């Protein structure tokens, strides 16, 4: 991050394992943070304990207390493993970060991600932090285990199984993601800045949770400054060319692209060969539009309106989360009922199926 990000982080961050009084303070970031060596920073993340949301007990642990069940992916800064906590039998995700592979810029991102997860303990639809240790030259960050990302799930459904995700499923994903993003904005005063299908995770129960907070931006009077963050294909027009500050509406655009992709099974733009092509398409061209009868499939008017409004090109007319929550499409699926239970059942089945049948969809 640029210097402005570093200052925002230092001014706003006090890293603690959680807000619970039973967990010790592990790190305070202050004006001297930049001078800390990489290993010292990572060591200071260590809690030495595991605390699960549904268990009041605090478990002291080391790497010997965890059974490695294999790598499940690569995240920011390290490899993610599926592990079993031997004392409880609980399955968790463990991100192992090599000290000698991380510099100052990556430290800032790591601290930001860790801080966001810790502070989001009570937040809806956000992956949970359980604890951390320093072992064998690595920092082991223990988190809630999810089964698969929406990126892999929807591609298997559409491209391999030649099927679709029904509108109830899209509605459930929409509500969970909007609620998570709104929590980040209202409670933590940050925007995600990297909303995309691969950062939306699903488990076998149909739970949907947001992850990857390494580039979250601190808001100053509801606006963020830096423009060097986020996945390029999902960036809002104002983040590609403008040097102006931006706000949560840039994440709303990314949400619109994401939901379009999940609902239709395809990315709304043709592949770009250069940044110039992207600028010509996203900044100078018309925004994507979902039609009620696109691809010989009928989409409801509430869904069409929700996605197309997220993709309003002029940021000034693009809604924020409170407005999105007033839309019929959100309100329909924000209320528990048989449609939501069926959506969760379908998502859970597809999540386990995709996890058990990995396919490389790249290209």
Swiss-Prot record:
<dbReference type="GO" id="GO:0004713">
    <property type="term" value="F:protein tyrosine kinase activity"/>
</dbReference>
<feature type="region of interest" description="Disordered">
    <location>
        <begin position="1"/>
        <end position="38"/>
    </location>
</feature>
<dbReference type="InterPro" id="IPR000719">
    <property type="entry name" value="Prot_kinase_dom"/>
</dbReference>
<dbReference type="InterPro" id="IPR017441">
    <property type="entry name" value="Protein_kinase_ATP_BS"/>
</dbReference>
<dbReference type="GO" id="GO:0106310">
    <property type="term" value="F:protein serine kinase activity"/>
</dbReference>
<dbReference type="GO" id="GO:0038066">
    <property type="term" value="P:p38MAPK cascade"/>
</dbReference>
<dbReference type="GO" id="GO:0050807">
    <property type="term" value="P:regulation of synapse organization"/>
</dbReference>
<dbReference type="GO" id="GO:0031435">
    <property type="term" value="F:mitogen-activated protein kinase kinase kinase binding"/>
</dbReference>
<dbReference type="GO" id="GO:0005524">
    <property type="term" value="F:ATP binding"/>
</dbReference>
<dbReference type="GO" id="GO:0004708">
    <property type="term" value="F:MAP kinase kinase activity"/>
</dbReference>
<dbReference type="Pfam" id="PF00069">
    <property type="entry name" value="Pkinase"/>
</dbReference>
<feature type="binding site">
    <location>
        <position position="95"/>
    </location>
    <ligand>
        <name>ATP</name>
    </ligand>
</feature>
<keyword id="KW-0808">Transferase</keyword>
<dbReference type="GO" id="GO:0000165">
    <property type="term" value="P:MAPK cascade"/>
</dbReference>
<feature type="domain" description="Protein kinase">
    <location>
        <begin position="66"/>
        <end position="330"/>
    </location>
</feature>
<dbReference type="GO" id="GO:0008582">
    <property type="term" value="P:regulation of synaptic assembly at neuromuscular junction"/>
</dbReference>
<dbReference type="InterPro" id="IPR011009">
    <property type="entry name" value="Kinase-like_dom_sf"/>
</dbReference>
<comment type="function">
    <text>Activity is required in presynaptic neurons, in a dose-dependent manner, for normal presynaptic development and morphology. Plays a role in the formation of muscle connections, also called muscle arm extensions, between the body wall and the motor axons in the dorsal and ventral cord.</text>
</comment>
<keyword id="KW-0418">Kinase</keyword>
<comment type="similarity">
    <text>Belongs to the protein kinase superfamily. STE Ser/Thr protein kinase family. MAP kinase kinase subfamily.</text>
</comment>
<feature type="compositionally biased region" description="Low complexity">
    <location>
        <begin position="14"/>
        <end position="28"/>
    </location>
</feature>
<dbReference type="GO" id="GO:0004674">
    <property type="term" value="F:protein serine/threonine kinase activity"/>
</dbReference>
<dbReference type="GO" id="GO:0048691">
    <property type="term" value="P:positive regulation of axon extension involved in regeneration"/>
</dbReference>
<keyword id="KW-0067">ATP-binding</keyword>
<feature type="active site" description="Proton acceptor">
    <location>
        <position position="194"/>
    </location>
</feature>
<keyword id="KW-0723">Serine/threonine-protein kinase</keyword>
<dbReference type="InterPro" id="IPR008271">
    <property type="entry name" value="Ser/Thr_kinase_AS"/>
</dbReference>
<feature type="binding site">
    <location>
        <begin position="72"/>
        <end position="80"/>
    </location>
    <ligand>
        <name>ATP</name>
    </ligand>
</feature>
<dbReference type="GO" id="GO:0031103">
    <property type="term" value="P:axon regeneration"/>
</dbReference>
<keyword id="KW-0963">Cytoplasm</keyword>
<protein>
    <recommendedName>
        <fullName>MAP kinase kinase mkk-4</fullName>
        <ecNumber>2.7.12.2</ecNumber>
    </recommendedName>
</protein>
<keyword id="KW-0547">Nucleotide-binding</keyword>
<dbReference type="GO" id="GO:0005737">
    <property type="term" value="C:cytoplasm"/>
</dbReference>
């Amino acid at each position: 991050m640029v210097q402005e990000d570093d200052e925002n982080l230092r001014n706003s961050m006090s890293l603690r394992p959680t807000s619970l009084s039973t967990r010790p303070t592990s790190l305070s970031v202050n004006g001297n943070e930049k001078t800390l060596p990489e290993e010292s920073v990572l060591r200071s993340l260590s809690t030495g304990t595991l605390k699960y949301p549904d268990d009041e007990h605090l478990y002291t642990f080391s790497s010997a207390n965890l059974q490695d069940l294999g790598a499940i992916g690569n995240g920011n800064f390290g490899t993610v493993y599926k592990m079993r906590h031997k004392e409880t039998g609980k399955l968790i995700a463990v991100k192992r970060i090599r000290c000698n592979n991380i510099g100052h810029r990556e430290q800032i991102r790591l601290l930001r991600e860790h801080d966001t997860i810790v502070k989001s303990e009570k937040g809806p639809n956000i992956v949970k932090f359980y604890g951390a240790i320093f072992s064998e030259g690595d920092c082991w960050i223990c988190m809630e285990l999810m089964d698969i990302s929406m990126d892999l799930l929807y591609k298997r459904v559409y491209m391999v199984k030649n099927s679709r995700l029904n509108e109830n499923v899209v509605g459930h994903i929409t509500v969970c993601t909007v609620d998570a993003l709104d929590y980040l904005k209202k409670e933590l005063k940050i925007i995600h800045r990297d909303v995309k299908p691969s950062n939306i995770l699903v488990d076998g129960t149909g739970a949907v949770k947001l992850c990857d907070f390494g580039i979250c931006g601190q808001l100053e009077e509801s606006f963020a400054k830096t423009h060097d963050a986020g996945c390029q294909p999902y960036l809002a027009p104002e983040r590609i060319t403008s040097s102006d500050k931006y706000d949560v509406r840039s994440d709303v655009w990314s949400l619109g692209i994401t939901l379009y992709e999940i609902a239709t099974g395809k990315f709304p733009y043709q592949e770009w060969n250069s940044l110039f092509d992207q600028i010509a398409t996203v900044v100078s061209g018309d925004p994507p539009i979902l039609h009620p009868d696109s691809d010989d499939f009928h989409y409801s008017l509430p869904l069409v309106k929700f996605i197309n409004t997220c993709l309003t090109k002029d940021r000034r007319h693009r809604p924020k989360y409170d407005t999105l929550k007033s839309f019929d499409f959100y309100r329909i699926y924000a209320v528990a009922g048989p449609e939501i239970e069926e959506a969760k059942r379908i998502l859970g089945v597809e999540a386990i199926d995709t996890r058990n049948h990995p396919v490389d969809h790249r290209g």
